[in-house]
Amino acid sequence: SGPVPSGCLRCICVVESGXRMPNPV
């Protein structure tokens, strides 16, 4: 989990490309 990107109401952090990226739920 982390800061929610602009324009994203509900997000979950997932491991992608060796890093954690916010993905819209």
Curated annotation (Swiss-Prot):
Enzyme Commission code(s) on record:
3.2.1.17
Q: Identify the residues that the record assigns to the I-type lysozyme domain, covering every copy.
A: 1-25
Q: Name one GO molecular function term.
A: lysozyme activity
Q: Which UniProt keywords apply?
A: Antimicrobial, Bacteriolytic enzyme, Glycosidase, Hydrolase
Domain of life, per UniProt, equals Eukaryota
The chemistry this enzyme catalyses reads: Hydrolysis of (1->4)-beta-linkages between N-acetylmuramic acid and N-acetyl-D-glucosamine residues in a peptidoglycan and between N-acetyl-D-glucosamine residues in chitodextrins
> Some GO term, biological process aspect, for this entry: which one?
killing of cells of another organism
Protein name per UniProt:
Lysozyme
Q: Which organism is it from?
A: Asterias rubens
